[in-house]
């Protein structure tokens, strides 16, 4: 059992549908939801002349359990007419990020639970006044002061220090010989 406004998808007061279904079959609930959303998208109940190639179509007046999982040719035409005649802007226009109600996003389009507070999730750029996001020489979105130890010495090695200009831990230029690809690092 359900109800929805016909062609109400882009009307803030009518973009709604209600479904009450006590079925334990999830597909049946999904079909009922698709049926009501079909009304929101300008689709009427299918008549006898409509065909979806199955036992029953999503917009049939009476759903035939889980077999009603396709929209009919009539429904597809009605949806196309809805788009052409009513030009529903909430469907045809790509919304601005500030117009959507959703989880904030970042570089990978998902904001992780441990999302970085240094970045604005709407722009994926550092927040104003922030210098860095992470690294051994970054704390609370700011570079650590020059001279802060970022890597303790081991053996005959020397401490490495932050330079106050980067989030990375630069290698101490006064270190003894170390090899990388056979060359001496200075």
From Swiss-Prot:
Binding site for Zn(2+): 35, 39, 45
Motif Cell attachment site positions after renumbering to this chain: 154-156
Known EC number: 3.4.24.-
Main location class: secreted
Disulfide bonds: 10-90, 50-74, 52-57, 132-141, 137-162, 138-167, 150-169
GO cellular component: extracellular region; plasma membrane
Domain Disintegrin: 103-177
Pyrrolidone carboxylic acid PTM positions: 131
InterPro entries according to UniProt: Disintegrin_CS, Disintegrin_dom, Disintegrin_dom_sf, MetalloPept_cat_dom_sf, Peptidase_M12B, Reprolysin_adamalysin
Top-rank lineage group of the source organism: Eukaryota
Keyword terms, alphabetized: Cell adhesion impairing toxin, Disulfide bond, Hemostasis impairing toxin, Hydrolase, Metal-binding, Metalloprotease, Pharmaceutical, Platelet aggregation inhibiting toxin, Protease, Pyrrolidone carboxylic acid, Secreted, Toxin, Zinc
Gene3D superfamilies, per database record: Collagenase (Catalytic Domain), Disintegrin domain
Enzyme class at the top of the EC tree: hydrolase
GO terms, molecular function: metal ion binding; metalloendopeptidase activity; toxin activity
GO annotation, biological process: proteolysis
Propeptide boundaries: 109-130, 180-186
Catalytic-site annotation from UniProt: 36
Cell compartment(s), UniProt: Secreted
Free-text tissue specificity from the UniProt record: Expressed by the venom gland.
Mutagenesis or variant effect for residue 174 to A: Increase in inhibitory potency towards aiibb3 (2.5-fold) and a5b1 (4.4-fold), and no change towards avb3
Record-linked Pfam families: Disintegrin, Reprolysin
Annotated ranges, domain Peptidase M12B: 1-95
Further remark: The disintegrin belongs to the short disintegrin subfamily.
Homology family: Belongs to the venom metalloproteinase (M12B) family. P-II subfamily. P-IIa sub-subfamily.
Subunit structure of this chain's protein: Monomer (disintegrin).
Protein name: Disintegrin metalloproteinase/disintegrin echistatin
């Amino acid at each position: 059992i359900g109800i929805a406004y016909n062609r109400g998808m882009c009307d803030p007061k009518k973009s709604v549908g209600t479904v009450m279904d006590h079925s334990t079959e999830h597909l049946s609930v999904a079909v009922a939801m698709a049926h009501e959303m079909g009304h929101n998208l300008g689709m009427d109940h299918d008549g006898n002349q409509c065909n979806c190639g199955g036992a029953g179509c999503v917009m049939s007046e009476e759903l035939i359990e889980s077999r009603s999982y396709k929209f009919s040719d009539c429904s597809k035409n009605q949806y196309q007419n809805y788009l052409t005649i009513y030009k529903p802007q909430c469907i045809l226009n790509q919304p601005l990020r500030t117009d959507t109600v959703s989880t904030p996003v970042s570089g990978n389009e998902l904001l992780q639970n441990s999302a970085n507070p240094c970045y604005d999730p709407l722009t994926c750029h550092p927040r104003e006044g922030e210098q860095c996001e992470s690294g051994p020489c970054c704390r609370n979105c700011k570079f650590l002061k020059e001279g802060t130890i970022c890597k303790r010495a081991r053996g005959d090695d020397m401490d490495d220090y932050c330079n106050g200009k980067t989030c990375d831990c630069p290698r101490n230029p006064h270190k003894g010989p170390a090899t990388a690809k056979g060359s001496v690092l200075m």
